[in-house]
Amino acid sequence: MEAAQDSQPTPRWDFLTNHAHVLVCVARDPGIRLRDIAAAVGITERAAHRIVSELVDEGYVVRERQGRRNRYQVKTKLPLRHPLAEEREVGDLLEVLIA
């Protein structure tokens, strides 16, 4: 009975999208593996790959191959995408989330 009281239910929604969570992972660890991103965010490795590819395609992340691994660089000066936040930069968001 005590274990049930101590465990927290998985939230059904979050304030941040999976894209934001992936961006935070990459900013914290530029050499992070897709499997580690997936585990940290709580998504499949395939979903992590899709999100990273979308961030790369849109120019928010640069992917550089180093041997058998990828290294990522977040472009912090780009504006956020939503009209309510477009006057802010990606770096502003990361500063709040990583601090």
Predicted regions span which residues?
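Amphipathic alpha-helical dimerization/coiled-coil segments
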Residues: 1-7, 79-99
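Short, locally clustered residues in the helix-turn-helix/winged-helix DNA-binding domain
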Residues: 24-28
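Key DNA-contact positions within bacterial/archaeal DNA-binding proteins
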Residues: 46
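Short, Lys/Arg-rich nucleic-acid/phosphate-binding segment
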Residues: 65-71
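Short alpha-helical segments that sit at the start of domains
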Residues: 2-21
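Alpha-helical residues within the helix-turn-helix
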Residues: 39, 56-57
